[in-house]
């Protein structure tokens, strides 16, 4: 698997020539100076970028990491990006029954352990059963991550948004 990243990058370059669209293992939005980020996959990233833009206008230093390439997991890239961030809210769209976190958050936590970064990690599961993930939901994730980044004690167990009790 160590030989696949250059192959994936070459295919992405070829795809750009044909389509005009560029893809990489991770897409970053306002991560350079962020204290807190949301890490997600898929269509949630667009909503997360919109919310991050609004929060930035309020003076909050937030960003978004969108994972494009899940396997092989971009451990080194994520570790490098998260090493500058105090707290990351990881959004999973599926429950991983019996596991301490959702699938994406488990891989982020594994990255944290393997690379010894100090970033705190929160896991939020939302969008279950095809439910919409609203900007207000993502804003809750950012706000919790910002409290965590400020050193405020927060519950770090998996939390669920938008589910019926």
List each language-model region with its residue ranges:
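Redox- and metal-dependent alpha/beta enzyme cores, enriched for Fe-S-associated oxidoreductases
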Residues: 33-60, 73-80
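Conformationally flexible catalytic loops at phosphate/diphosphate-handling active centers
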Residues: 1-27
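Peripheral docking tails and interdomain loops at the edges
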Residues: 92-165
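Short helix-loop-beta junction
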Residues: 10, 18, 50-64, 113-114
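Hydrophobic alpha-helical scaffolding
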Residues: 1-5, 41, 68, 94, ...
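A structural-propensity feature for long, helix-poor, extended segments
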Residues: 77-99
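Structural motif
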Residues: 71-77, 131-135
């Amino acid at each position: 698997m160590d030989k696949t990243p250059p192959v994936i990058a070459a295919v992405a370059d070829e795809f750009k020539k044909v389509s005009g669209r560029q893809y990489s293992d991770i897409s970053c939005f306002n991560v350079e100076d962020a204290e807190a980020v949301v890490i997600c996959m898929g269509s949630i990233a667009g909503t997360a970028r919109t919310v991050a833009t609004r929060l930035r206008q309020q003076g909050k230093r937030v960003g978004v990491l969108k994972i494009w390439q899940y396997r092989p997991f971009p451990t080194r890239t994520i570790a490098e990006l998260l090493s500058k961030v105090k707290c990351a809210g990881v959004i999973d769209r599926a429950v991983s029954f019996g596991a301490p976190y959702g699938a994406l958050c488990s891989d982020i936590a594994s990255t944290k352990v393997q690379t010894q970064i100090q970033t705190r990690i929160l896991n939020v599961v939302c969008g279950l059963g095809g439910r919409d993930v609203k900007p207000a939901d993502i804003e809750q994730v950012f706000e919790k991550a910002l409290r965590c980044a400020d050193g405020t004690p927060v519950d770090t167990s998996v939390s669920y948004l938008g589910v019926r009790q």
